[in-house]
Amino acid sequence: LAEENLQARIRGNILMTIANKKDALLLNTGNKTETALGYCTLYGDMCGALAVISDLNKNEVYGLGNWINEKYEKTIIPESSLNKAPSAELSHNQVDPFDYKIISPLVEDIITNGYNVEKLVESGYDYEICREIINRIRLFEYKRHQGAPGIRVSKKAFGTGRRYPIINQYKI
């Protein structure tokens, strides 16, 4: 994992250098689901001046890509990107360890709707998955404090609209 994170950080440094040389801003492409789960690397894929899709969950990002292609009646977002298994692409044949069809709505219910474990289980989610995801959201708050500011499109986004302590084993 340390070597994979190093790869992401080197890539981030290269992209920041290119942006700097071109007098441009690097856009961050982290989404709400990955950010919630801490499935991102500080000073790596979290680099950037503006997180343009940070308030869209993983499923919404794919939906947006498909919508763009349909709206413009041509392939702007490559089909290969929209149809492949999600991956951080930090090792050979790596795929993300989450089923985003389940996890993205769960993250939305926790973050946007403020559901607690009891309400989540009532809604049909598995208790253990709920506990795991809530714990990940709590554990990785420190990363979100260091991420690029994002564009808010939901009623509850990470950033100034949602800040929690990062010390003293704070529980959500």
Placement of each model-derived feature along the sequence:
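ATP/NTP-dependent adenylation/nucleotidyl-transfer catalytic domains that generate, transfer
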Residues: 1-172
